[in-house]
């Protein structure tokens, strides 16, 4: 589904859904607990925000941690099989894209309005020029084989001193 199609669907889903919520887990928490646990945490946070609690939870993917006493089912490629999962995917993606476009205003050199934070060749190149910022996940290797770029020259001194 294209970005334009998702943008058309988003207000329809938000208007017509019985209940919906989107939750975010910041990059520091992702670095601390890992991306899978952070995704499950975000799902739980979104479930906490629903006006009406679900009777059954459908999850896109193969992992989920039980939420309260509500039964759940994990469905691989669930967004292609269930309208509710597809709608949740549209909301999650459009809200994340909106967040990344907002970050782009502060960090235009990463071109987050275009790459949405994905490690494109251009994004990786900009990291080699500007380093990473607080909005990058430190646990995600953006520059394989080259290591992470250093933000400050002092980091190079500390790094080289620690290997002596």
Outline where the language-model segments fall.
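RNase H-like, Mg2+-dependent phosphodiesterase core
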Residues: 1-164
